[in-house]
Every structure is written in C-alpha cells, then in structure tokens.
Amino acid sequence: MPSILLINGPNLNLLGTREPHLYGSTTLPQLEDNAKALAASKGVKLESFQSNHEGQIVDRIHEARGHTDAIIINPGAFTHTSVAIRDALIGVSIPFIEVHITNVHAREEFRHHSYLSDKAAACIIGLGTYGYEAAIEYAVREIISAKYVY
C-alpha cells in the first residue's frame, strides 16, 4: 500500500490554542485524523509524527527510507534554521512537500527564507490547515500515481 509520512515540527503540538487568529482552531490530533481519513479514502496509508526536537525529526526522516513514498512536512521554525533536516530529506531521496499554515512571506522578514523549498516537490503556503489536504491530494496525484497504477 502506498504511504505518506506527515511530519510536524516545533510548536505545532499547540495547534488549536497557539495564536488561533493565525493558525486556526483545529488541533493537531484533529488535523492528523482528517489527514489519515483523506489518505485512506485514496488507498494510501498516512503516518503522522510531531516533535519539537530537530534530531528526532532527522531520525524519523531516516526511518522512512525504503518504505515511504512521499513526505509532507511542516517544519515550523526549523524551516528557517535547519540544514540538518534539509540534508536528511535530500539523503533519503523521498519526494517531499513543504507545508505552512500561514503565509510566511507576509510575516516577519526572518520567516521569508526556507532551507527546504528549493528541494521540495511542492510548497503549500498560507492555506490554513487546508494546506495539508492539498498536500495529500498532490502527493497522491503527482508522486504516488507515478509509482503505482490506480
């Protein structure tokens, strides 16, 4: 069965309560449940992982090698700082989609640079939590369908 790994980085465990005017009221468990249901409706298994620790995210990316077809990642603040996550994603050769709930380009200057975007199969920015659904749709249509016949 095709599979997607969904990774959420630092502070995304606070979704639903952290700055709801920016990030909305959907909690991380709700987001993950919705993502799993959408993926399952398309015949795809989705695993989710969240960590506030860079090394744990790197380790989880490494573990995906060989049995994951696509990665959807919201790296949170690590977007702007983590060469390690960039190198891990490049190293496992799994296509990935970078997702951000807010439009990072309309926010503080330091949020405008991503260490991941130039290597991503796609970037989905500013669509709220719907961005995760869009990422799943894209992963199934453009990445997974190239490997599997539906």
Swiss-Prot record:
An example Pfam family from this entry, by short name, is: DHquinase_II
Task: Alphabetically list the UniProt keywords.
Answer: Lyase, Quinate metabolism
Catalytic reactions of this protein: 3-dehydroquinate = 3-dehydroshikimate + H2O
Gene Ontology BP annotations: 3,4-dihydroxybenzoate biosynthetic process; quinate catabolic process
Q: In which pathway does it act?
A: Aromatic compound metabolism; 3,4-dihydroxybenzoate biosynthesis; 3,4-dihydroxybenzoate from 3-dehydroquinate: step 1/2
Q: Which residues bind substrate?
A: 74, 80, 87, 101-102, 111
Question: What residues form the catalytic site here?
Answer: 23, 100
The site feature described as Transition state stabilizer is recorded at 18
Q: Which PROSITE patterns match?
A: DEHYDROQUINASE_II
- Report the EC number(s), separated by commas if there are several: 4.2.1.10
List the GO molecular function terms. 3-dehydroquinate dehydratase activity
Instruction: Please state what class of enzyme this protein is.
Output: lyase
Supply the InterPro entries for this chain. DHquinase_II (IPR001874), DHquinase_II_CS (IPR018509), DHquinase_II_sf (IPR036441)
Assembly and oligomerization: Homododecamer. Adopts a ring-like structure, composed of an arrangement of two hexameric rings stacked on top of one another.
**Protein's job:** Is involved in the catabolism of quinate. Allows the utilization of quinate as carbon source via the beta-ketoadipate pathway.
Q: Which family does it belong to?
A: Belongs to the type-II 3-dehydroquinase family.
Q: What is this protein called?
A: Catabolic 3-dehydroquinase 2
Q: Which organism is it from?
A: Neosartorya fischeri (strain ATCC 1020 / DSM 3700 / CBS 544.65 / FGSC A1164 / JCM 1740 / NRRL 181 / WB 181) (Aspergillus fischerianus)
Taxonomic classification, please?
Eukaryota, Fungi, Dikarya, Ascomycota, Pezizomycotina
